[in-house]
């Protein structure tokens, strides 16, 4: 009995260490609506960082670029290249949208690892990266869906919907289903990767608090940047596809 109770106590201890709570939220009531307060707080912080960086970038441009100006110009050229590669020659109007998506997701992902959110105590739940919440990733994916529908309809008019019966009307249900799976795949891919990364770091810090979590945190920073690039690239690809035709 002593051996059995000892084993049970060990299992309970391991359960307590790895029992990371997911899904608790701090709610705000705005009118008749209930919103996730912690997501709004962290999103506002990310937006403030982006607006502050943009203000610094354009406040005093130099003929001979400074190191900071070179950095922001490099970021802009990178976003332009991604947009042009995926959308084609008509990429220009979509650079702000793709750039906003990429930078918001990139800074949001990195904020989860670099900003000490846990210093701010909430009545329920805790602060984390905005992209750690499924509501944020679904909202970004739905914005992408609206964007590629708008791109297709603005270029082709109602003829855009003809793609659903190409190459044969038999594929109509599959083609319609495809447009529903695009935002789902975008949102769940981003949410799953960011949540899993933060949970792995939290569990490792609980088990081995000093050295072991550091390489995982650096790997998380790398994968966070890759996830932002994947989301922006796929968003641009969907927009380009809606403008060119069904593939």
From Swiss-Prot:
InterPro entries hit by this protein: ATP_syn_F0_a_bact/chloroplast (IPR045082), ATP_synth_F0_asu (IPR000568), ATP_synth_F0_asu_AS (IPR023011), F0_ATP_A_sf (IPR035908)
Compartments where located: Plastid, Chloroplast thylakoid membrane
Membrane topology (UniProt): Multi-pass membrane protein
GO cellular component: chloroplast thylakoid membrane; plasma membrane; proton-transporting ATP synthase complex
Transmembrane segments: 38-58, 95-115, 134-154, 199-219, 220-240
UniProt GO MF annotations: proton-transporting ATP synthase activity, rotational mechanism
Main localization, broad class: plastid
PROSITE patterns for the chain: ATPASE_A
Keywords in alphabetical order: ATP synthesis, CF(0), Chloroplast, Hydrogen ion transport, Ion transport, Membrane, Plastid, Thylakoid, Transmembrane, Transmembrane helix, Transport
Quaternary assembly: F-type ATPases have 2 components, CF(1) - the catalytic core - and CF(0) - the membrane proton channel. CF(1) has five subunits: alpha(3), beta(3), gamma(1), delta(1), epsilon(1). CF(0) has four main subunits: a, b, b' and c.
Entry similarity comment: Belongs to the ATPase A chain family.
Biological function: Key component of the proton channel; it plays a direct role in the translocation of protons across the membrane.
Name of the protein described by the UniProt record: ATP synthase subunit a, chloroplastic
Lineage start: Eukaryota, Viridiplantae, Streptophyta, Embryophyta, Tracheophyta
Name of the gene encoding the protein in the UniProt record: atpI
């Amino acid at each position: 009995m002593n051996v059995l109770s000892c084993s049970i106590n060990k299992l309970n201890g391991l359960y307590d260490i790895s029992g990371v709570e997911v899904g608790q939220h701090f709610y705000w009531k705005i009118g008749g609506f209930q919103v996730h307060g912690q997501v709004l707080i962290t999103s506002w912080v990310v937006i403030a960082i982006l607006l502050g960086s943009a203000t610094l970038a354009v406040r005093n441009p130099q003929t001979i670029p400074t190191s900071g100006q070179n950095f922001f110009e490099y970021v802009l050229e990178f976003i332009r290249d991604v947009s042009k590669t995926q959308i084609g020659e008509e990429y220009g109007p979509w650079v702000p949208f793709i750039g906003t998506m990429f930078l918001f997701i990139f800074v949001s992902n990195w904020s989860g690892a670099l900003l000490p959110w846990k210093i701010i105590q909430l009545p329920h739940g805790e602060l984390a990266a905005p992209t750690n919440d499924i509501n944020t990733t679904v909202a970004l994916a739905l914005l992408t869906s609206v964007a590629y529908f708008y791109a297709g309809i603005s270029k082709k008019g109602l003829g855009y919907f003809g793609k659903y019966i190409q190459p044969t009307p038999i594929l109509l249900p599959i083609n319609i289903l495809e447009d529903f799976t695009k935002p789902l795949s975008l949102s769940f891919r981003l949410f799953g990767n960011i949540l899993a990364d933060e949970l792995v770091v939290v569990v490792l810090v609980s088990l081995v608090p000093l050295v072991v979590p550091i390489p995982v945190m650096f790997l998380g920073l790398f994968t966070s940047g890759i996830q932002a690039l994947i989301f922006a690239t796929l968003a641009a690809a969907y927009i380009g596809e809606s403008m060119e035709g069904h593939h």
